[in-house]
Amino acid sequence: MIKIYDTMSRDLREFVPIEDGKIKMYVCGPTVYNYIHVGNARSTVAFDTIRRYFEYRGYKVAYISNFTDVDDKIINRAREEGITPQEVADKYIAAFREDVTALGVKPATRHPRVVEFMADIIRFVEDLIEKGFAYESQGDVYFRVEKSHNYAKLANKTLEDLDLGASGRTDEETARKENTVDFALWKSSKPGEISWDSPWGPGRPGWHIECSVMSTEILGDTIDIHGGGADLEFPHHTNEIAQSEAKTGKAFANYWMHNGFVNIDNVKMSKSLGNFITVHDALKTLDGQVLRFFFATQHYRKPINFTEKAVRDAETNLKYLKNTYEQPFTGNVDAQELQNFKDKFVAAMDEDFNAANGITVVFEMAKWINSGNYDASVKQALADMLEIFGIVFVEEVLDAEIEDLIQKRQEARANRDFATADQIRDQLVTQGIKLLDTKDGVRWTRD
């Protein structure tokens, strides 16, 4: 039984899908104006792991993660780089795909872009106006927050204690509103800015309406899971809930999931502090699988501390698992013990996708593997577990010369010609091949 920590209820809840065997899941993707940073990557990796685990447990997952390609930040970056907003979005979408591929992230079932849904967004806003939940003011359209039942419940806030600066309001904008907490559904454009025609004049959608429309258009009015970083609880996800449920009269999502932040050397990552690390830069010195494995060392909801030591520890541990995986696996299987490991792994992951505990079981299993010689079913079980964390080991094929040397060394040992055997071992070491002589035969690793 899978349990999920639901941000809305602030409790572990048994997962019950809308439709048996199927899951509809929407995760907020990046605003594509720059390379993603390691905090963005953690969110992408966390929900990729969750998706993979659902699939491991037999569910068919419709996994949607958007690209926000209409935003003030994109417009500003276009001015800086002297290109169009469309070119900025295309450039950083390509960079995102390259980065997350290096991290072993599976492509979403669909990666929608805001520009593909402009007509749907306009119809959504019109519907909210007709229902009395929104109003037009000087070319802008705002949502009437006071009409929303339990607004900001997700963030555990009330209208009275909301941070009025959360949406970056200006005095000019506030003057156009009926209430200072109302948020924009549609924003009129300034001269020279990218815009789309609408019943309220040329403009572009607000950030929050974009995800509501893409989610409901692709997955329907109610989805199983909506996810994203903890920073999205308010105002983004809060406003998504308000506008979506106002339009449909139905629950927007049955479970809300949020991942924790990434700290750099115990300090919150921020551009102002100069400790901002993009994945593009991190991958210049780190293997993508190492970074991915590092993220798995902490529960997805907890903050994780990015340090040189933590990353290098992840690298060492990943190498140990790789060496374990590359053993011959030519022995027998202990079916009961193997099933025990599978059951322990499922129990760990069923408890709100606790990757850290799941990885602990993987290491216990690796220790067991290294203590004996088991068959290919054990290897497959190890591979299946690791794949949930996006770790796929490609077995290295030794070239003919190295294979021949290993065979000759085995023959020399059989003939008690230990001088020749040692000479061949030393020769293999110079080629990065380390041999391990065990009671079950020779195993090798590549340094």
Regions found by a protein language model. Name each.
Residues 1-31, 48, 118-327:
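Alpha-helical recognition segments enriched in aromatics with Gly/Pro capping
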Residues 268-447:
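Structural preference for alpha-helix termini/caps and helix-kink/transition segments
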Residues 67-71, 93-96, 106-121, 139-148:
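Short, glycine/charge-rich beta-strand/loop segments that flank catalytic centers
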Residues 9-14, 18-106, 437, 444:
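N-terminal, positively charged nucleic-acid-binding surface of large information/translation enzymes
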